[in-house]
Amino acid sequence: MAASSSEISEMKGVEESPEVPGEGPGHSEAETGPPQVLAGVPDQPEALQPGPDTTAALVDSGPKAELAPETTETPAGASETAQATDLSLSPGGESKANCSPEDLCQETVSKPEVSKETTADQGSRLESAAPPEPAPEPAPQPDPQPDSQPTPKPALQPELPTQEDPTPEILSESVGEKQENGAVVPLQAGDGEEGPAPEPHSPPSKKSPPANGAPPRVLQQLVEEDRMGRAHSGHPGSPRGSLSRHPSSQLAGPGVEGGEGTQKPRDYIILAILSCFCPMWPVNIVAFAYAVMSRNSLQQGDVDGAQRLGRVAKLLSIVALVGGVLIIIASCVINLGVYK
């Protein structure tokens, strides 16, 4: 048994010897035979297993007690050498073998991290996609708004007439003020609502206004006076028309604008000049002045004034002539009678 144990130790040494010098000259074998290195890595548990088996076999069969500890020591050394060779040949393999559970743990840790990152990304995407979702939420909100809008509308509609009611009053007040400023009598407070406001000015007449702006009523009165003057012209107490210069288109002569078949008013200026030779000096001078005024009014188009002034000039000139003739006769009689 001792020989067998020694042989086993030698065989293990021989097996370890080509593996240990793999670092030096026998490195080519390790390089050329990667399957041996790969086979050596899984053989580690096999090298560890025969240790206790051999210890049990040697303890049971071997009568010598010294060999048992030797055999027990040799597998431990063999295992150490095998581990050293494994470390020398494949440092990456040990790291892989030793770190394989750590790598798995790291991978498992990284996987939940990746899953957390993916979940965080998905959550951020969902959050980014989530803001549009509240947009439809205010969509039902406009529904109560139109419902709420019609409610104030009926309240506003009756208020509109109340606001529009003061406008007629304001207009009536403004119209009243304008009428007061325009020298028109304003209406009372309730007249503006009951009926239309009276026109402040009468509608314009179709007839053309006179040259000097005389109203039609005055013209009618002047025409009547002229007719009365013509009827009573021979009587000393006949009413005489006014000496104002008011136009009249009815009495215009053929040579005057507006005259149609009527006689041109005479100014009697020749008669007034003859009366100036009579000894009625103030009267004949006044008659001459009226005759000149009559001609001027006729040139201005005031036919009625020219006719009226001519009539006065005629009367004064006749008085001056008659008076002058009488004075001359009286003076002659007196002078001739005295001398006789």
Curated annotation (Swiss-Prot):
Q: Where is the composition biased (Pro residues)?
A: 131-155, 197-207
Q: Where are the transmembrane segments?
A: 318-338
> Where do the record's region annotations for Disordered lie?
1-261
Kindly give the membrane topology term recorded for this protein: Single-pass membrane protein
What superkingdom does the record give? Eukaryota
Question: Which family is this protein grouped under?
Answer: Belongs to the CD225/Dispanin family.
Q: Would you tell me the protein name for this molecule?
A: Proline-rich transmembrane protein 2
Where are the Omega-N-methylarginine modifications?
240
Sequence ranges on the Extracellular membrane side: 339-340
Residues bearing PTM Phosphothreonine:
74
User: Keywords for this entry?
Assistant: Cell membrane, Cell projection, Cytoplasmic vesicle, Membrane, Methylation, Phosphoprotein, Postsynaptic cell membrane, Synapse, Transmembrane, Transmembrane helix
UniProt source species: Pongo abelii
